[in-house]
Amino acid sequence: MVANSIIRDLNDILKKQLTAINQFFVHSKIQKKNGLLSIAMQYAKLGINGGKTAEKLIEILVDLDELPQIKDYDLLKSHRDIQKQLSFDTALILSMIDSIHKCLKKCKESEELALTTSLSEILLDIEKQSDFLESQLSIIDSIGLNLYTEGLKKPFAISHSK
């Protein structure tokens, strides 16, 4: 039987993932409205990939005979400014990564090998999202917000992530 603290952690990770999905989709729509087409497309993909990750978490919880807490969300942090969007989203993803690491530690200590494997795979997916978001903030720091947003008005200005 899996410890209750691990179940709570899994539901907390799910809550953050569900929040991220909604935040990504809201930001995608704002970006599209502002003509930032390439990053709007990337954000839509982040939301879709986040849905796949949430599905994996739900399957894990169901396999453990637990009811996933899909009604729980954190407060969405949204803004019209692309740099603030990226900052909010990066903070949320980094918080999720921290939660996954804590849960992984408990799983390893409890010798929950199947959970450790599943969470490690999820962690890799989330770290890719973090890499993308942090790289966009780094580009803004390097070239400035004006040049960055001008480049985003082209549909394929940034590389596509999986």
Features from the language model and the residues they span:
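Iron-associated oxidoreductase/ferritin-like identity signal
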Residues: 1-162
